[in-house]
Amino acid sequence: MIQAGVVAVQGDVSEHAAAIRRAGESHSISVEIVEIRQSGVVPDCDVLLIPGGESTAISRLLDREGIDTEIQAHVEAGKPVLATCAGLIIAARDAKDDRVETLDIIDVTVDRNAFGRQIDSFEAPLDVDGLDEPFPAVFIRAPVIDAAGEDATVLAQWEDNPVAVQDGAVVATAFHPELTPDSRIHDLAFFANQNNNVDTAVSTD
C-alpha cells in the first residue's frame, strides 16, 4: 500500500483520488488517500498531487502553513509529485506573477491562463511520451509553458507549446487528467515512471 497526499485547498480532489486508485489497481497496489490542508501530513506521504484551482490562493496557503517546504523536501528525497493546471504554475521555477510563490520543483517558466485568453476550455488528443495511445486532455483556462530548462523533459506539446513536462520524479501538466476516466497520466507519474522511488514504498496485495 502507498499513501497518496492530495493538496485539498481547491480543485478536483475526489476525481484525482479516484484516478490514483485506478492507476494503483492496475499494478495491484492499494492506495490510501490523505487530504493535505496543514503541515505535518506531507512527510508521511509516498506520492503527492497538486491539483488545479486558483494558483495564488493555493500558493498562499502552502506558504502560510509551511507545506511548501515539506513538498520541496519530498521532491529532494526523490519521491513522486504530479502537478496539474494550477499545480503546474505553483510547481514551476517561475510563474511570471509576483502573487504566486512558486515551489521551484520543476525547471519551467509558465504563463498563467494563457489558453483562457482565447477559449475557456477544450479537449484535444495528445501524444504523450510513455503512453502508447493519445491521451484525451481537457484544458480549462490552462497555463502555457513558455520555457523548459535543461532539467525538464517535454512529454507532450499542443500547437508547439509544451503542456506536459517531467523533471526527475516530478510530472506536471497544463491540462486536467482527472476529468477523464483515463488514468494513464497518474499511472505515468506514480507507478510506471522508473525515475521515481515509489517502488520502494509499496507492497502488492
UniProtKB/Swiss-Prot annotation:
> What are the leading ranks of the lineage?
Archaea, Methanobacteriati, Methanobacteriota, Stenosarchaea group, Halobacteria
- CDD domains, sorted: GATase1_PB
The record ties this protein, via Gene3D superfamilies, to: 3.40.50.880
> Which positions does UniProt annotate for L-glutamine binding?
53-55, 112, 140-141
Cite the record's note on assembly. Answer: In the presence of PdxS, forms a dodecamer of heterodimers. Only shows activity in the heterodimer.
Quote the protein name from its UniProt record: Pyridoxal 5'-phosphate synthase subunit PdxT
Which GO terms fall under molecular function for this chain's record? glutaminase activity; pyridoxal 5'-phosphate synthase (glutamine hydrolysing) activity
Q: Which GO terms describe its cellular component?
A: cytosol; glutaminase complex
Q: Which family does it belong to?
A: Belongs to the glutaminase PdxT/SNO family.
Q: What keywords were assigned to this record?
A: Glutamine amidotransferase, Hydrolase, Lyase, Pyridoxal phosphate
Q: GO:BP terms for this protein?
A: glutamine catabolic process; pyridoxal phosphate biosynthetic process; pyridoxine metabolic process
Top-level taxon of the source organism: Archaea
Q: Which InterPro entries match?
A: Class_I_gatase-like (IPR029062), PdxT/SNO (IPR002161), PdxT/SNO_CS (IPR021196)
Has keyword DNA-binding? no
EC numbers on record: 4.3.3.6, 3.5.1.2
Name of the gene this protein is made from: pdxT
Which biological pathway?
A: Cofactor biosynthesis; pyridoxal 5'-phosphate biosynthesis
Q: Which reaction does it catalyse?
A: aldehydo-D-ribose 5-phosphate + D-glyceraldehyde 3-phosphate + L-glutamine = pyridoxal 5'-phosphate + L-glutamate + phosphate + 3 H2O + H(+); L-glutamine + H2O = L-glutamate + NH4(+)
What role is this protein assigned? Catalyzes the hydrolysis of glutamine to glutamate and ammonia as part of the biosynthesis of pyridoxal 5'-phosphate. The resulting ammonia molecule is channeled to the active site of PdxS.
